[in-house]
Every structure is written in C-alpha cells, then in structure tokens.
Amino acid sequence: MIRKVVLCLLASPIFIASLCAADSRAIADGAFDEFIRQDFASLAKRFSPEMSAALPLEKLAGVSPVLKQLGALRTGRPTPQIMAVQGMNVFIYTCDFSMTRMNIVITVNPAGQIAGLQIAPPPAEAPKPGELVVVTDSIKLPATLALPTGTGPFPIVVLVHGSGPNDRDETVGANAPFKDLAEGLAARGVATLRYVKRTKQYPQSPVATVKEEVIDDALSALALARQQPGVDPQRVFLLGHSMGAYLAPRIAQGGPAPAGIVLLAGSVRPILDLAREQLQYLGAPLSMLDTLRASAPASYWDDLAGYDPVALARKVQAPFLILQGERDYQVTMTDFNLWREGLKARQDVTLKSYPKLNHLFLEGEGKSLPAEYSTPGHIPAYVLDDIAAFVKKPAGR
C-alpha cells in the first residue's frame, strides 16, 4: 500500500579510514548491482556493523517483493549523483523501472562499508509559471484543470490518489488512470482537477497522519475547484481511488459536502489487514508487514485505529457511486460487499462491479498480478460512462 520503502540510513560514528570518491563509487556500483539482481547474501557482506544490526539478511531478503513491484530496470545501471554527507559518500541512482521511477540511494562510509540503503521517489518538478497550484499552508502542489469544450459551467470532479507518492496522473507502470479519467470525462462534459500528491512533491517531508498525507490537500483541491471559471461551484464532486476512496468519508466531513462522491476500489478494512491479504495472494513473506509498519510513524497507525469508513459514510450528506473491479487483488470484493451491506439503507448509493477489471480499472483475464500493470491500457468507456452519468444526474433524482 505504501510504496516508499526506507530500508535503512545509518551513519557510523567512527570514521576508520578515508576512501576516495572513485573507490567509493566502485563499492556503491557493486552494491547497486547486487541489490538489483537480489543477491542479498553478497550485498549484506558489504554492510557496516551498524547496518548489519539494523538490516540483517533475513530482513533484507524481505525487500524482494518491493523490487518485483518496481518491475525490470529499463536500462543498465544509471550514473549516480554523488554527494558528500558527514564524511561519507552518498550515491543517488535515478532508475527507470518498468513500473515507476525511483531513486536508489547508497551510502558508503570511509571504511568502504555500506552505511545506508534507501528506495525513495525522486523529487518532483517545481510548478510551472501560470500552472494551477493546490496550496495548503506552505505546501504547494502542481495541479491540472481539464475542462470540456463548449460552454459551461461544468460539473467538476476532484481526483484523490491511492497510497504512495503519486503524480497527478496516478501513474503506475505503463498506465495513467487519472489522465484517462480526466480525458474521458472531459469528452463527456465533466471537468476534473488532479494534482501531485504531497508525498511525491515533498518526498523528504514526513507526514504524521493521513490528514497531512491526503485529507488537507484534498480539501484544498476541492476549494480550488470551486473557484475555477467555467465550473459550477454547486456541482463539485470528489473521486477517490483506493486509499483516496478509503479516506473519502473523512475528506467529505472536513469541509463543505461535495455534490457527490465516487469511490473506485475503496477499501473498508484496515491497511495492514489488506497488506497481509496481498502478501498472501502473491506468496510474499509476511515479514514485509514489518517493513510497511516501519515506513510510517506510530502516529500514522494510531490515527487510523478504529476508523470505519462505512460508518462515517452513513453520516455524509451526499450521494455515492461505488465501483469495483472484480479481478482486483489489492482491494477485493470483500470490501465492496462491506460497502453494500453497510449502506444498504441509503437510497442515494449506487454500487457496481466489473468482472474484467483490476485495481487500476483496466481490463484483463484470469488472475491479476503486479506484472499486469506494466502492460499499457486505458479505463474502459463503460466506466467513464457510469461516472459521467452519476455526475450529470440532476440533484434529487
């Protein structure tokens, strides 16, 4: 669920010897190659004592599913950016994987040992002049407004990402579901606003809870959408995908009620429960749960303890459209049926599932696997039709 995975970053307090940058580069390159080919036994031999204690071989090997989710490295080993930090050399390899772009950061101490290893998203680009920006206090997130052709005012849908450091298109592998939604809905007379997620734009800035990670910026985006020329401020809708759908009831409770809420692959169960189910589905070691739990502070999990999105949704005074891919292994039909059961008393809730669709709402056959996301695809017209019909339906009907 949380795609940014910090393996370890430790600085040895004792500098035994000084290594020139060229020697350090050779060590870092070797460690990079071993990491990519998952030769964890060889890689672990390069660790400093502190690193070995923090990341023993059995934990290091548990990173294998993370590397599989990134996909294959599209090119050979990239030339790293080199920085000197506290007497150590830090090598930043910006890697184009088949599923995403990530930095692999390797720190070499003066003794020639690996003192740090990190997978993190590269810094996002700064907003372009004249570009829309979602502003929350000091946070500034580049945004894109997609308007239909013709005369407005148009209804508008604000798109809220799933977990992880997402760009404005919610790019996963070869696919960009939010771009599909923006273009497809514009062709159907519906405007959209999409933006770079905070954890993508500010990858080094910690977030204590989902309020900082998701909710505050979604509320700012909804407010920005209401201010746009050509948009009907009374018809501003919220669309959440995956974690964005999970948190949609909290977002809706944080400000003026949206005209309606669309949930795509909205989970109901706790994040760690879903993660366990995903690991079991993929045959991955359950030790990865420890990595996931450690990727966020205790305050993050405490904030979500006891959160019941269905119970909160019952209190939201807005119609819901809840859509689910039946081939989705990340958020399954179990969650969809929990929505159905929990909101069955509401007359303004529409639920629909699609037999061929996966978590990204792309068509496929048989068992869905992460490799499927590397195949280019697009959200089908029938999903776009269903969303547009919901948004354009007159209020009270």
Predicted features, each with a name:
Residues 153-162:
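Short beta-strand element of the alpha/beta-hydrolase
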Residues 208-229:
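Alpha/beta-hydrolase active-site loop
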Residues 26-29, 41-88:
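Short solvent-exposed beta->alpha transition segments
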Residues 118-151:
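N-terminal cap/lid segment of alpha/beta-hydrolase-fold proteins
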Residues 316, 322-324:
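Short beta-strand/loop motif that positions the catalytic acidic residue
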Residues 360, 365-397:
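Catalytic active-site module of serine/aspartate enzymes centered on a nucleophile-bearing elbow/loop
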Residues 180-202:
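Conserved alpha/beta-hydrolase
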Residues 329-335:
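Conserved alpha/beta-hydrolase "acid-adjacent" motif
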